């Protein structure tokens, strides 16, 4: 195959020509490009014969979008093959899922999961804690667990953090008899959390009762006039076995909870062994991902 590597200025671009040129309206294709169009080339790689008129800055920027590297890549492949173009068989690569990830990727995934668990906690808030406590990972996690919205979720009164923040924003929550309108309000040891008397408190009490007693069992306690007492006793024994499987969320050891009065109090500072997450994070071992804030400033 004939080769000509003379660099010429053709519409202000360097190119290599191989074989005979053929014209199709306003586009040129070499013999090489005609053959390899099906395999390698894309439509954007074709270049026009006539230059475009300068209309503005936008048209000037389009000239730089022509890909020279792709053409060089095609030529280098053809030189190896010796003029014959064919598709090589694609070998399937087996991926070992058991293979351990790199420490950076592992820490970065944990960092993102950790922030999403706290409903996309802002980096600004996260970095302030990092500077305040001088990179001590244990203290940072303890301070995040002392937030009001997090204490409500751990207690079991609330199903999600969205619901907890809604209660706080609508000013239904009291801390030591005062309204707490911010979800990031930090609680100290000995503080008591309670709810305002109103419709919100009644809804929570109804929900907690449903968790323990089923609808069928309530009818038995309300309807006292039973004709068949023996049959009634048999049903009660059967129901007790079913209620054993029903469990209420008691909360961690560092919280004291009363379900009847809807009160929460923080007895001691939270420990890492008592904290649990829905994803695979062991705070006793994998806490070092917080140190990424110091090394990599552009984390999102």
Swiss-Prot record:
The keyword RNA-binding applies. InterPro entries: Ribosomal_uS4, S4_RNA-bd, S4_RNA-bd_sf. Residues 146-209 form the S4 RNA-binding domain. Keywords: Mitochondrion, Ribonucleoprotein, Ribosomal protein, RNA-binding, rRNA-binding. Its main location: mitochondrion. GO terms for cellular component: cytoplasm; mitochondrial small ribosomal subunit; small ribosomal subunit. Pfam families: S4 (PF01479). SMART domains: S4 (SM00363). GO terms for molecular function: rRNA binding; structural constituent of ribosome. One of its GO terms (biological process) is regulation of cell cycle. Coiled coil: none annotated. The keyword Ribonucleoprotein applies. It is found in: Mitochondrion. Belongs to the universal ribosomal protein uS4 family. This is Small ribosomal subunit protein uS4m. It comes from Dictyostelium discoideum. The lineage of its organism: Eukaryota, Amoebozoa, Evosea, Eumycetozoa, Dictyostelia. The gene is mrps4.
